């Protein structure tokens, strides 16, 4: 088992500590750690928690390939923005989006991201967008869940004169991405979350 109960509450067992240290990198690295746990404790159930947009847009498209590598493993994926406590919530892996400021946890980076503007070719048709400054004349879509918003991003690029309200504001990245796919404006999003839409030619950076 991964956790054991003591007078101080739930604590990691030796196997649990080994598992957490092994979990790093992308899905193949998660898979290596999972395989080790299965061999050590014959566990056939992997419980994963992640943020909703990351779970839907990045993790889910890769789960089938992961399952093919470990066909006997049952996978449970729970998505929320809540802070997970491993002992309380019965979670094996928590995939978080942030700046690694979790001092009580063993944290490994799965993948670094880039935050870029994305839009559909339909929206860009007939619009002359050649520079960052040209974005000021466009419909910018805001997502509450991104670590970097339009205001900060434009300031970092030393773009001045931006003082407009967003026509569309969403609290989930997958909603912002879908709005951009529908030609409703330009989003500022993670290349990881928008990657599938780009590969399918629904969006372009």
Predicted feature descriptions by range:
Residues 1-12:
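A short LG(V/I)-centered, amphipathic sequence patch enriched
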Residues 13-16, 86, 135, 178-183, ...:
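Hydrophobic residues within well-ordered alpha-helices
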Residues 19-40:
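Alpha-helical linker/hinge and terminal dimerization helices associated
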Residues 39-46, 134-136:
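Immediate post-signal peptide segment of exported/extracytoplasmic ligand-binding proteins
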Residues 43-103:
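Central regulatory/effector-binding core of bacterial HTH transcription factors
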Residues 52-53, 121-122, 145-148, 174, ...:
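Alpha-helix/helix-capping structural signal
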Residues 76-169:
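Acidic, Gly/Pro-rich loop/turn segments at junctions of secondary structure
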Residues 162-205:
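Hydrophobic hinge/microswitch elements
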